[in-house]
Amino acid sequence: MSALVLLDLSAAFGTVHHGTLLEVLSLRFGITGSVLEWFKSYLTGRTQTVTISSDTSAAVPLVCSVPQGSVVGSLLFIAYTGDIEESIDVYSLEHDLYADDTQLLSHMCMAEIQHRREAFENCVLAIQDWCASRRLQLNPDKTEIMWFGSRSNLAKLHMDDLCLRLGSFVINPSETVRNLGVLLDGELTIRPHIARTASTCVFHLRRLRQLRRLADQSTMQRLVSVFVIARLDYWIQYWLNYRLLLWHL
C-alpha cells in the first residue's frame, strides 16, 4: 500500500512576504551585498490594480508576492519555502517539492496504515504551523489524500482508516487526483487520464475542423501540435507502460 497527500497553498506566489524573503536569502543562502540589493530592487516598487469593466482602482503598493510565471519568481518561491523539508523529515515521510506543489508519500504494509495515517496528520499540522510562520496559508479544502494498492487491498480498507483529520476538519480520500497534470486512480492504471485526454483531444479536433477552410495547412499543423499533439506527448514515457489502454487514443 502507498498513500499520497497533495498539499494546496492558497495564492501561494501572491503571499510571499518581501521582507521575510530577503531575510531567508541572506540568512539561509548567504546572499548579501549587491546581489541581495538586486533582489530587493526586483521586489520593490511593484503595485497592483483591480479593473472592473472600464473602471480601474488606484495602484496599491505590494509588500507580498513574486511574479508567477517569471524566471525568477519560481526560484524565489523555492528558496522561500525550501526549509519546509525540516518539518516533514521529523515524520519520516518521503516528499517531493515542485515549486508550490508539495507532496507527501509513504509506503506501508496493511498493519501500518493507522500509524502512517497518523504520521500524515501530524505532518500536515506541522506544515500548517510552518506556513503560518511564513505568512502562507495551507488550504485544507483543496488538500487531497490518495491511497494506492491492489484492488483486493483497497477493498479491505474502511473509510475511518483513509481519512485525514486536521483538528475538526476531515479530508476524505479521493478516487482520482491530478498530479502534475496527470489524473491517477488508486490502482495506478491512469484510465481516468487516458479518458480525459481522449475527450479533450476530440473536442479540439472538432473545433479545429471548423477552421480548415479559413487557415492554410501550415497554420493547421501548428494548431494541431499545440492543442492535440502536446497533450499526447506529455508524460509519453509513462504511457508506454499501459499499451493495452491506449486504444482509447
Segments the model singles out, each with a brief description of its role:
Residues 111, 122, 136-176:
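Short, conserved micro-motifs composed of acidic
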Residues 168-240:
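Basic, alpha-helical interaction scaffolds
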